[in-house]
């Protein structure tokens, strides 16, 4: 029996096409015979799972960091930690270390950090210091030099990565019932000098600086922003601090 060349060519091409189709189909799935039954083993897209992360935060400062006259969970480092927990995956964990005490100056804070000797592997560090330098009448030159020293110490606590430091401005206690006992404008003018120095240094060295002083200057008009001691910020005031700190903190540790 002789096939017409035209039909032979057609049959040949059809056969080749079928073989190619079968070949590529086999590349997409394989069949495995188990206990006499054919099971299809279809490759699945590999989904990369996020591994649990542990973030370590350290906050350095004075009464504004330790949260004088508010509950432990009300102080701003705790509120910041809790806000980060809500933002990140449930499997992630956060640790918070605070080195701060009411009345501390820059000198006191430097000594305390040296004494505590915290590890250098933190994910984020905050620094808020200087009000007691002003209140105790320490020379401004002391703040100028020791603030820079504290910035460098803080950076060392996050693996020498300045992008993981947030400097927070000094609150203004002039706008509290206690602060009203002093000459109007005197406290605010001095604290402006402290904050301006810190802000300029941070700008020059590409360090994040968060200004919260204006929040505390609403304390007379809005007494809810002042704690029960008539001097320090309330939990509400600290929550407003965190509103400004949170997006920056997320960006730094994400």
How would you describe each model-predicted region?
Residues 2-15:
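Bacterial N-terminal signal peptides that target proteins for export
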Residues 22-25:
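C-terminal motif of bacterial Sec signal peptides marking the signal peptidase cleavage site
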Residues 27-29:
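Bacterial signal peptide processing site
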Residues 33-100, 114-120:
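Serine-esterase "nucleophile elbow" of acetyl-processing enzymes
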Residues 69, 97-105, 141, 182-183, ...:
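Acidic/histidine-rich helix-loop elements
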Residues 110-254:
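Alpha-helical cap/lid subdomain in secreted, periplasmic
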């Amino acid at each position: 029996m002789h096939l017409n060349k035209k039909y032979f060519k057609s049959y040949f091409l059809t056969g080749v096409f079928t073989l190619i189709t079968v070949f590529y189909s086999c590349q997409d799935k394989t069949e495995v015979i188990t206990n006499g039954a054919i099971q299809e083993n279809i490759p699945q897209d590999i989904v990369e799972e996020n591994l649990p992360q542990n973030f370590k935060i350290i906050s350095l400062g004075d009464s504004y960091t330790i949260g004088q006259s508010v509950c432990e969970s009300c102080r701003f480092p705790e509120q910041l930690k809790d806000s980060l927990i809500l933002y990140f995956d449930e499997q992630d964990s956060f640790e918070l270390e605070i080195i701060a005490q009411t009345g501390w100056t820059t000198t006191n804070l430097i000594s305390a950090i040296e004494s505590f000797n915290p590890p250098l592997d933190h994910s984020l560090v905050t620094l808020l210091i200087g009000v007691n330098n002003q209140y105790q009448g320490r020379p401004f030159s002391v703040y100028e030099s020791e603030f820079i020293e504290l910035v460098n110490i803080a950076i060392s606590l996050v693996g020498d990565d300045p992008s993981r430091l947030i400097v927070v401005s000094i609150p203004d206690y002039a706008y509290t019932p206690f602060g009203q006992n002093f000459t109007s404008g005197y406290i605010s003018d001095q604290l402006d000098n402290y904050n301006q120095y810190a802000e300029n240094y941070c700008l020059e060295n590409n360090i994040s600086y968060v200004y919260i002083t204006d929040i505390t200057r609403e304390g007379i008009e809005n007494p809810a922003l002042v704690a029960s001691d008539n001097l320090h910020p309330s939990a509400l005031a600290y929550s407003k601090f965190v509103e400004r700190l949170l997006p920056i903190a997320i960006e730094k540790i994400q």
